[in-house]
Swiss-Prot record:
Catalysis performed (reactions): ATP + H2O + a folded polypeptide = ADP + phosphate + an unfolded polypeptide
Primary location group: cytoplasm
GO biological process assignments: protein refolding
Keyword annotations: ATP-binding, Chaperone, Cytoplasm, Isomerase, Nucleotide-binding, Stress response
GO molecular function terms listed in the Swiss-Prot or TrEMBL record: ATP binding; ATP-dependent protein folding chaperone; isomerase activity; unfolded protein binding
Enzyme class of the recorded protein, top EC level: isomerase
Protein name, per record: Chaperonin GroEL 2
Annotated binding of ATP, by residue: T29, L30, G31, P32, D86, G87, T88, T89, T90, G413, N478, A479, A480, D494
Gene that encodes it: groEL2
Function field: Together with its co-chaperonin GroES, plays an essential role in assisting protein folding. The GroEL-GroES system forms a nano-cage that allows encapsulation of the non-native substrate proteins and provides a physical environment optimized to promote and accelerate protein folding.
Length: 557
């Protein structure tokens, strides 16, 4: 395919146009008075959202050069979401400001490499400063973080705080849609496994890049599965039940994996596979833990069970299973508390008998996974558009809360960034001249999120920024009330991890844009209009597709 090549100032300006197109649509959602964005869907009703990452993912520009710039911003938002779980809109506003100021200086003849070096050195120093001023989160502050991230929804904030209290800060909390109109919290048996899907072709939710299975069966084995023939008896039994299947094995490869992927794609089977956690003897023990938790059996030849003779009762059950590229969360389908307590007792006995610190740590981890359970927040609302938006808000709040617990907190509402801007001058004192300009670019960009929060609230951003600069560390602008007050006392808090990730990712992408000298993109092909063919005759020629019946072509049924 032919390529479009763009050089120098032209290439950078095209990137900037793409950056601005996406950032302008995202930044209006920032803050407690952020505006909504209506997203048209190819199928179904339009979606009304107030969530930066959701808006960013939906945008694709017609011009391929500009679209490259938009995709860079999507990368910033996505990376921040992956690392911190929140702060995507803040990261977008920061990177737009960095690129805007940076390109002005590049156009004026400043060396872009020196600018990038100044931006990188300043960012590195500011990250250390964030760690110094952050305070540990505890007690009511957990609910405050969740409330702010959920759009000042106190009910959600309290629910997330209760979930953290019930399963501990290291526990697993999931969010799912409820069939009722109310949002409620439930703690159930379940487990978090640090293994993701073997193949991305198992994905069922393309937007989230996850596998989501409901009312599923689980095949747990310590075997490595290479041939599909080993799985045929089990697959037949599960297919008759019409339930999804998760395979947990040492590995699934060769024609076994290929056949599963093909039949999942054809809709013949709803199936996914993950590798078993752990190694050696510890792996078998972990698999046995999962089997007990999910009311099934470990299929192992060591105990006289094989795949071809396994009954449907040997398969485990799960209410829901969620798998991403790195982790799997299983919510158990039935209550097996006596068996779980018995298993925990066995592990505690091993814990008492071992002298190895490593073994003690791993045994304690197993007890925590079995005893901790999973907190499930069931989101209810009508209509469907409100349900989706509410679920997004709760997921954002949950992610922000986890980030706050992990790396402490600081004042929110853009105040921490304003404080960091005041630290730039002493940081740049030993920089070279053009590097100092890079530091100044960071300093100005750090004001952009607060300015945008104020603009979205209908205030003059520059006036608000000026007043906040002259305030004490904890004092800032509460856009929800229009007051200047102690933000931490008011519950307006930013997790340090969110601020750090937003700044680091924004600086990284901005540096790439400033040092870009050429862009190579594919030239869009003009598709010729296809005239209607009067001889199509009702598409009768499709009758030959009748041979796709089930898995017959693969020898499975």
């Amino acid at each position: 395919m032919a390529k479009i090549i763009s050089f120098d100032e032209e290439s950078r300006r095209a990137l900037e146009r793409g950056v601005n197109a996406l950032a302008d649509a995202v930044k209006i959602t920032l803050g407690p008075k952020g505006r909504n964005v209506l997203l048209e869907k190819k199928y179904g009703t339009p979606q009304i959202v107030n969530d930066g990452i959701t808006v960013a993912k939906e945008i694709e520009l017609e011009d391929p050069l500009e679209n490259t710039g938009a995709r860079l911003i999507q990368e910033v938002a996505s990376k921040t979401k992956d690392v911190a779980g929140d702060g995507t809109t803040t990261a977008t506003v920061l990177v737009q400001a960095l690129i805007k100021e940076g390109l002005k200086n590049v156009a004026a003849g400043i060396n872009p490499v020196s600018l990038k070096r100044g931006i990188d050195k300043t960012t590195e120093a500011l990250v250390e400063e964030i760690a110094k001023v952050a305070k540990p989160v505890e007690g009511s502050a957990i609910a405050q973080v969740a409330t702010v991230s959920a759009g000042n929804d106190e009910e959600v904030g309290g629910m997330i705080a209760e979930a953290v209290e019930r399963v501990t800060k290291d526990g697993v909390i999931t969010v799912e849609e409820s069939k009722s109109l109310t949002t409620e919290l439930d703690v159930v048996e379940g487990m978090h496994i640090d293994r993701g899907y073997i193949s991305p072709y198992f994905i069922t939710n393309n937007e989230r890049q996850t596998v989501e299975l409901e009312n599923a069966r689980i095949l747990i084995t310590d075997k490595k599965i290479n041939s599909i023939q080993e799985l045929v008896p089990v697959l037949k039994k599960v297919a008759r039940l019409g339930q999804p299947l998760l395979i947990v094995a040492e590995d699934v490869e060769g024609d076994a994996l290929a056949t599963l992927v093909v039949n999942k794609a054809r809709g013949v089977l709803s199936v996914a596979a993950i590798k078993a956690p752990g190694f050696g003897e510890r792996r078998k023990a972990l698999l046995q833990d999962i089997a007990i938790l999910t009311d099934g059996q470990l299929i192992s030849e060591e105990i006289g069970l094989s795949l071809d003779t396994a009954s449907i009762d040997a398969l485990c059950t799960a209410r829901t299973i969620t798998i991403d590229k790195e982790n799997t969360t299983i919510v158990a389908g039935t209550t097996t508390k006596p068996e779980i307590q018995k298993r925990i007792g066995q592990i505690r006995k091993q814990l008492e008998e071992t002298d190895s610190e490593y073994d003690k740590e791993k045994l304690q981890e197993r007890i925590a996974k079995l005893a901790g359970g999973i907190a499930v927040i069931k989101v209810g609302a009508v209509p469907e558009t409100e349900l989706k938006d509410r679920k997004l808000r709760i997921e954002n709040a949950l992610n922000a809360t986890k980030a706050a617990v992990a790396e402490s907190i600081g004042p929110g509402g853009g105040k921490t960034l304003i404080y960091l801007a005041s630290k730039v001058d002493p940081i740049k004192a030993y920089f070279e001249e053009e590097e100092k300009i890079g530091a100044d670019i960071v300093k100005r960009a750090l004001e952009a999120p607060l300015r945008q929060i104020a603009d979205n609230a209908g205030e003059e951003g520059s006036v608000i920024v000026s007043r906040v600069k002259d305030s004490d560390f904890n004092v800032g602008y509460n856009a929800a009330t229009g007051e200047f007050e102690d933000l931490i006392a008011a519950g307006i808090i930013d997790p340090a991890k969110v601020v750090r990730s937003a700044l680091q990712n924004a600086a990284s992408i901005a540096g790439l844009v400033l040092t870009t000298e050429a862009i190579v993109v594919e030239k869009p092909e003009k598709k010729p209009a296809v005239p209607a063919d009067p001889g199509m005759g009702g598409m009768g020629g499709m009758g030959g597709m009748g041979g796709m019946g089930g898995m017959g072509g693969m020898g499975m049924f």
